């Protein structure tokens, strides 16, 4: 049976992890969300989230966006290539409802899958 947990090793935790992705990223984006990715050698994907206060003013909205993004990653982690991902929320993402945001994230995960040609 496939585990759908979200343990610590599936997260980008340090600034060095984020810098690694920002150096040579493959990107996929919508007007509201961008996902940068870079291949890693760990054998499993990892994710980091950036939701700027400048783009999403209210803390509960930032938390909602992060919660939905983590859940989307958790459900798709076994179908994703072994990459480090950084999810960047842009202006207007707080206006999306949960269903629309989840669909946008699923579309971007599929796009990264096609770009890496390992899915």
Curated annotation (Swiss-Prot):
It comes from the Bacteria. InterPro entries: Ribosomal_Su5_D2-typ_SF, Ribsml_uS5_D2-typ_fold_subgr, RNase_P, RNase_P_CS. GO terms for biological process: tRNA 5'-leader removal. Its EC number is 3.1.26.5. It is an enzyme of class 3 (hydrolase). PROSITE patterns: RIBONUCLEASE_P. Consists of a catalytic RNA component (M1 or rnpB) and a protein subunit. Belongs to the RnpA family. RNaseP catalyzes the removal of the 5'-leader sequence from pre-tRNA to produce the mature 5'-terminus. It can also cleave other RNA substrates such as 4.5S RNA. The protein component plays an auxiliary but essential role in vivo by binding to the 5'-leader sequence and broadening the substrate specificity of the ribozyme. PANTHER family: RIBONUCLEASE P PROTEIN COMPONENT. This is Ribonuclease P protein component. It comes from Sodalis glossinidius (strain morsitans). The gene is rnpA.
